[in-house]
Curated annotation (Swiss-Prot):
Descriptive protein name: DNA-binding protein HU
Keyword DNA-binding: yes
One of the GO biological process terms: chromosome condensation
GO cellular component: cytosol
Recorded family membership: Belongs to the bacterial histone-like protein family.
Keyword NAD belongs to the record: no
PROSITE patterns named in the record: HISTONE_LIKE
Subunit relationships: Has been isolated in complexes with 5S rRNA and bL25, and with 5S rRNA, bL25 and uL5. Homodimer.
């Protein structure tokens, strides 16, 4: 069984351009604009919900105490925020097949 290929942004641009008949540069501009708007919304604390696909959101990780592996010294790990994706039902169902 061959390994699955990673699909890059350039691959997606090529595939969308082929499927729609639009020029690659126009599709790339749209993809870049979409991703920039998702980043902007997340940076502003908003969720981005794409019905049937999923939701992008910022989640919070609480502060906690950790241990440095080399010295076994206890360290404080500060609270952080990180981007997360929760797949929608339609995407989950598609992947299960």
């Amino acid at each position: 069984m061959a390994a699955k290929k990673t699909v890059t942004k350039a691959d997606l641009v090529d595939q969308v351009a082929q499927a729609t008949g639009l020029k690659k540069k126009d599709v790339k501009a749209m993809v870049d604009a979409l991703l920039a708007k998702v980043e902007e919304a997340l940076a502003n604390g908003s969720k981005v919900q794409l019905t049937g696909f999923g939701t992008f959101e910022v989640r919070k990780r609480k502060a906690r105490t950790g241990v440095k592996p080399g010295t076994k010294e206890k360290i404080k790990i500060p609270a952080t925020q990180y981007p997360a994706f929760k797949p929608g039902k339609a995407l989950k169902d598609k992947v299960k097949k």
